[in-house]
Swiss-Prot record:
GO terms for molecular function: rRNA binding; structural constituent of ribosome. Keywords: Ribonucleoprotein, Ribosomal protein, RNA-binding, rRNA-binding. Residues 103-122 are annotated as: Disordered. Belongs to the universal ribosomal protein uL22 family. This is Large ribosomal subunit protein uL22. Part of the 50S ribosomal subunit. GO terms for biological process: translation. This protein binds specifically to 23S rRNA; its binding is stimulated by other ribosomal proteins, e.g. L4, L17, and L20. It is important during the early stages of 50S assembly. It makes multiple contacts with different domains of the 23S rRNA in the assembled 50S subunit and ribosome. SUPFAM superfamilies: Ribosomal protein L22. GO terms for cellular component: cytosolic large ribosomal subunit.
Amino acid sequence: MSKALLRFVRLSPTKARLIARQIQGMNVELAIASLEFTPNKAGRVLSKVVASAVANGSLDAKSALIVSCRVDAGPVIRRSIPRAKGRATAIRKPTSHVFVEVAEGKEMKSSKSHKKNQAEGK
């Protein structure tokens, strides 16, 4: 099992979580192919992090699976923009921390469903 972490990426966590949920549990090769054609910034960022996780564990992309893909909120960068009558309003620029965990296909059993089955005695 190998991991990759990208911190402080200038990306909205709510928008990135939509894409992260789609690729969780997918084959790595299929996930990277689908992320390259996703028409937003989160697709490009997640594609690079998944590729990095595969390279970190020196795994084969054809047989590896994405065990978990998590996007956490990072610090919010605040900027001000001038407005009428001498006022200024705040602009929020959110950042994210992207965490991807990749494993060989047979290790996918270590998910929540496997733990639940063990608790039930199956």
